[in-house]
Amino acid sequence: MPLPRDPTLIYTDKAEVARAPVLKMVFRRANDSLMIVGPRAVEDEEWRELLMKLREEFRMSAVCTAPYKGNDLGRKMGIVEAATLLQRDAPVLGVHPDLVVFTGSRTDVTDRVLQGLRHARPDLVKVSLNPEYCPSADYSLPTVKRDQFLQELKALVGI
């Protein structure tokens, strides 16, 4: 499958296209992982439920960047605020994450944040769990339709 062309890409290396088995290994290897949940994931009930199961299975801390009632998806925090804390290697929710998972945000926003993190924190493993490929992450799912994307999330959770 050819990778989509991204006119904003400023780095020569791109994200590894990863599926559920590889992502499971990456998640298990992390000591302190952080999930940043955006508005698209909050609005889609099935996506949101799968993320809550994924968070429980891999013991991830979570930050929700969208208005959401409840704290199932973590503390409310803006994506820029979370990115600034990550770039400065400051604790986010009391931990110094070694893995950050972006899901549910717009692709251009996710890409910009990941470009900044790639420059400021090369030691941080960055994963994009969106239906669109994100070249600035270390690992990203390929561009797929919503149904295939949810199947990948189900495979990650083990459903």
Curated annotation (Swiss-Prot):
InterPro entries: CdhB (IPR003704), DHS-like_NAD/FAD-binding_dom (IPR029035). GO terms for biological process: methanogenesis, from acetate. It comes from the Archaea. Disulfide bonds: none annotated. Signal peptide: none annotated. It holds the Pfam family CO_dh. Belongs to the CdhB family. Part of a complex that catalyzes the reversible cleavage of acetyl-CoA, allowing autotrophic growth from CO(2). The alpha-epsilon subcomponent functions as a carbon monoxide dehydrogenase. The precise role of the epsilon subunit is unclear; it may have a stabilizing role within the alpha(2)epsilon(2) component and/or be involved in electron transfer to FAD during a potential FAD-mediated CO oxidation. Heterotetramer of two alpha and two epsilon subunits. The ACDS complex is made up of alpha, epsilon, beta, gamma and delta subunits with a probable stoichiometry of (alpha(2)epsilon(2))(4)-beta(8)-(gamma(1)delta(1))(8). This is Acetyl-CoA decarbonylase/synthase complex subunit epsilon. The lineage of its organism: Archaea, Methanobacteriati, Methanobacteriota, Methanomada group, Methanopyri.
